[in-house]
Amino acid sequence: MKFSQSLIALAACFLPLIAAAPEEAQHAKIRSPGAQDIILDSYIVVFNKGVNDADIESEFASVSHILSKRRPAHKGVGHKYNITGFKGYQIETDTGSIGEIAASPLVAWIERDGKVQANALETRSGATWGLGRISHKATGSNSYVYDSSAGSGSTVYVVDSGIYIEHSEFEGRAKWGANYISGSPDTDENGHGTHCAGTIAGATYGVASKANLVAVKVLDGDGSGSNSGVIAGINFVGQNGKDGKSVLSMSLGGSYSAALNSAVESTISNGVTVVVAAGNDGADASNYSPASAKNAITVGAVDSTDTRADFSNYGSVLDVFAPGVDVKSAWIGSKSASNTISGTSMATPHVAGLAAYLIGLGGLSSPAAVASKIASIGIQGSVKDPKGSVNLIAYNGNGA
């Protein structure tokens, strides 16, 4: 990106201020996600709230000057984030440069980038049962009872490994949105995102079979990605999602990240309902992101007997449980491919689809209203071994 001479000159005015800042103050701004899975030399820089676009352009000129003095091997500024309430960027650079950047009065804090992973487990043979569970008060049903609106008018952004949009399950309702995996094609190379999309809005497997789907690729063929890449995906949704009509579904996670949580929270404030996986470590979900993001709908997994899956994270940040063991849905490889897998990744799209379904029914104009509706109609007290979590199973309010 090119900058005018006037911006570069303006940036130079800030350099003495940056150089003069105490070293302790610089280091105090630099945080680590609660993780061992740090991405070396990659950082997420978060601006103070209220910083305007002119200030940001000036800051990028200042950063360019800082980087010009350092090793050229680093890539420099990558993803840029511009969600109302959350502005910043990702940068690859050395520790010396990041210390200078931290000294800027425009920077609120900086977080070391961390890895995220798809929250899916082993592949098994099995049969579809999740749709029956979320449309009946009792276990064991093989039928899905739902209103014919089926999520019509709603859009679900699947922030994941992409979607095989040509799959017959999607009937032309899935499209490509954005790709934040460098050098990868605009398709799902893993299968995880396609499986989640099928549970959300597939013709056969979907909770909201008339909802629209948008693929936002942040995970590679191995199901891996970065916090900075996920935030880039969230930024895309925040800029394109329609207030009150959009759902963001994320069946992924990693260790706690304040930056990732902040991006989620800002997107919710902008009118997008966000549904996230609790995680698969059988641990307290408050230590994971985006599971711990405030006001996101965090989903744990149960099996066909309403028992919390042993892998499912738990705790006070959970909002609801949904089917997550032996869930059958669409897959990659052919237009009719399917697969049966387990994980909180599989529970999450049931609830994302439910959110889209409820939006399609009408009368819900905000993420808070959607979350409240899911909580009010859910099946209370049926989860075995909730382990300190809310005892609530997702339900669409239709079947007996």
From Swiss-Prot:
Residues of the site described as Cleavage: N119, A120
Superkingdom, natural source: Eukaryota
GO-annotated molecular function: serine-type endopeptidase activity
Location(s), subcellular: Secreted
Secretion signal, residue range per the UniProt entry: 1-20
Inhibitor I9 domain sequence ranges: 42-117
Regulation: Potently inhibited by the serine peptidase inhibitor chymostatin. Also inhibited by antpain and PMSF.
Propeptide: 21-119
Keywords: Glycoprotein, Hydrolase, Protease, Secreted, Serine protease, Signal
CDD domains: Peptidases_S8_PCSK9_ProteinaseK_like
Record InterPro entries: PCSK9_ProteinaseK-like, Peptidase_S8/S53_dom, Peptidase_S8/S53_dom_sf, Peptidase_S8_Asp-AS, Peptidase_S8_His-AS, Peptidase_S8_Ser-AS, Peptidase_S8_subtilisin-like, Peptidase_S8_subtilisin-rel
Catalytic residues (UniProt): D160, H192, S345
GO cellular component: extracellular region
List of glycosylated residues: N82
PROSITE patterns associated with the record: SUBTILASE, SUBTILASE_ASP, SUBTILASE_HIS, SUBTILASE_SER
Enzyme Commission number: 3.4.21.-
Summary of temperature dependence: Optimum temperature is 20-30 degrees Celsius.
Location of the Peptidase S8 domain: 128-400
pH-activity note: Optimum pH is 9-10.
Example GO BP: proteolysis
Main location: secreted
Family: Belongs to the peptidase S8 family.
Function comment: Major secreted subtilisin-like serine endopeptidase. Preferentially cleaves substrates containing hydrophobic residues at P4, positively charged residues at P3, small or flexible residues at P2, and large, bulky residues at P1. Mediates the degradation of collagen, the major structural protein in the mammalian host. Degrades the nonhelical regions of collagen that function in the cross-linking of the helical components. May function as virulence factor involved in epidermal wing necrosis observed in white nose syndrome (WNS) in bats.
UniProt name for this protein: Subtilisin-like protease 2
Naturally occurring in which organism (per UniProt): Pseudogymnoascus destructans (strain ATCC MYA-4855 / 20631-21)
Lineage, highest ranks first: Eukaryota, Fungi, Dikarya, Ascomycota, Pezizomycotina
Encoding gene, per UniProt annotation: SP2
